[in-house]
Amino acid sequence: MKDIISVYDFSKSDFDELFELADKLRNMSTYPKILKEKTVALAFFEPSTRTYLSFNKAAINLGASTIGFSGEEGTSIAKGENLADTIRMLNNYADMIVIRHKFDGAAKFASEISEIPVINAGDGKHEHPTQTVIDFYTIYRNFKNIDGLTFGLMGDLRYARVVNSFLRALTRFKPKKVYLISPPQLSARKEILEELNYPYREVIDYNEVIEEIDVLYVTRIQKERFPDESEYEKVKESYVVDMNLVSKMKKDAIILHALPRVNEISREVDKTPQAKYFEQASYAVPVRMAIFHKIVGE
């Protein structure tokens, strides 16, 4: 596997292998140095905390040195250097590139120029494939399976790249049902829905379906996406996970969030058995270590 640009780059067996490898890596006190004498470039044209640091830690754990930036300030990009030239430059300095960019398709564009492997760490509102592997690994850890579960994705389903990757990755499995819970202004994109091979239903009021859901994936309602602020005011409180919502969920259901959150999950929910988003974040390093293994073929 040379590049990871989309979740479609993973087969069902790839997911299974990554889960198994992440399990092994989580339990190791020392790690195989499969990236010894290698350099990983972290080219984060958008600022990042969790993704940047977890990729950095994963690479170092496997013996690599890392170079890179998070945000364009202080780089030649801020002076106007184009993406193609930056990627060509990084090919001279590194053995692998992890890229995050604000434009859809930037990771694929980079992979077409690059002679070294490229991993997509989020491109615009397109995809975030390695986050989805973390999401699915969290589900696997809690349910031992992904097939047969009922999913609810709630909040901004139009602009959140994690949603696109999540929905696409589910085509590799057999979910019982998927509920897409959002205001009409932020409903999932038609082109994404046309790719799905499993039953789904679009819902405005979570109360209609919350009791059925095994996995609730929450994203932030983005005020800046609404052309009319009054429309945002109408829906902003409708998609907050609070204790009232949790009380209606199955006892063994789980709540996921890619983080960072703003106010879409109340702090009081953090201590409930359903809250798994910090556990989810803790899997970022072992899962991304497993992804590096997949890239180098070891």
From Swiss-Prot:
UniProt cross-references to Gene3D superfamilies, sorted A to Z: Aspartate/ornithine carbamoyltransferase
One GO molecular-function entry: amino acid binding
Superkingdom per UniProt: Archaea
Lineage, uppermost ranks: Archaea, Thermoproteota, Thermoprotei, Sulfolobales, Sulfolobaceae
UniProt protein name: Aspartate carbamoyltransferase catalytic subunit
UniProt keyword Ligase present: no
Reaction(s) catalysed by this chain's protein: carbamoyl phosphate + L-aspartate = N-carbamoyl-L-aspartate + phosphate + H(+)
Cited InterPro entries: Asp/Orn_carbamoyltranf_P-bd, Asp/Orn_carbamoylTrfase, Asp/Orn_carbamoylTrfase_sf, Asp_carbamoyltransf, Asp_carbamoyltransf_Asp/Orn-bd
Annotated source species: Sulfurisphaera tokodaii (strain DSM 16993 / JCM 10545 / NBRC 100140 / 7)
Pfam families in UniProt: OTCace, OTCace_N
This protein's pathway: Pyrimidine metabolism; UMP biosynthesis via de novo pathway; (S)-dihydroorotate from bicarbonate: step 2/3
Keywords (A to Z) from UniProt: Pyrimidine biosynthesis, Transferase
